[in-house]
Amino acid sequence: MYGSIIIDPAGPETIRADRDHVVLFSDWTDEDPMRVFAKLKVQGDYYNYNQPTIFDFFRDVSRDGVSAALDKRKMWNEMRMSPTDLADLSSATLTYLANGVTPAGNWTALFRPGERVRLRMVNGAGNTFYDVRIPGLKLTVVHVDGVDVEPVTVDEFRFGPGETIDVIVEPRDDAYTIFAQSMDRTGYARATLAVREGLQAPVPALDPVEWLGMSDMMGAMSHGTSGADMEMTGMSGMTGMAGMSGAMAGMDHGAMGGMNHGGMAW
């Protein structure tokens, strides 16, 4: 079954809108899913075509200097991680859909100028985190994951599989593009908000790929520590931890073999 489930409130509707549309974003591959899984088991970044290149290195050298460019790569190489590991799957195997329609299909939601339109955005993808915006319109977030929230106006938002975000927009022009680009910037889903069928607005170019930072990589660790009161006393075997700098450049990954996992309380 493919679709969204909208549950109306038991009492009066608290969010005023003249028109209401559901926009369900998803992704699809024509490959055998088990073949996709087998590829990822062999090589986790099989579908990542945004790997750092020699041209990126020379660009960083010209902008930041040789030392900074080398240090930037040294850190990631020592961790044996990719700074562009943003998604397991990319447009190399996925098609990004809006209400089951490809970007070329131009699914359209209708409105009349001056109406308050509620767009119920649903991420029904199996893999993709989407960054959503509507060029030319502000998005007022009013409802998140089944709960009304204090309205906040944004230009763009990111949501992952299983999340829902409702926004209010007040369009004035004839057509707007609902643009949802994948977090790894390899593709996008799009729909159109228009006064009649057949119209479309310009589709933005994909944003440049941004490297992950240490805050991205360490965020999960810090959340896990605060939420579960993780004890570090059992990690004495990690001799490399003693010399770990803020950039983790000096981290001795070879010493992790002596890590006493039994002493870690979760």
Please place each PLM-identified region on the residue numbering.
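Terminal connector regions
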Residues: 174-205
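Ser/Thr/Pro-rich, low-complexity mucin-like regions
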Residues: 129, 173-174
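Histidine-centered copper-binding motifs that mark active-site loops
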Residues: 1-133, 137-159, 167-168, 197-249, ...
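Ligand-binding face of N-terminal immunoglobulin V-set domains in extracellular IgSF glycoproteins
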Residues: 162
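Short, hydrophobic beta-strand segments
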Residues: 165-173
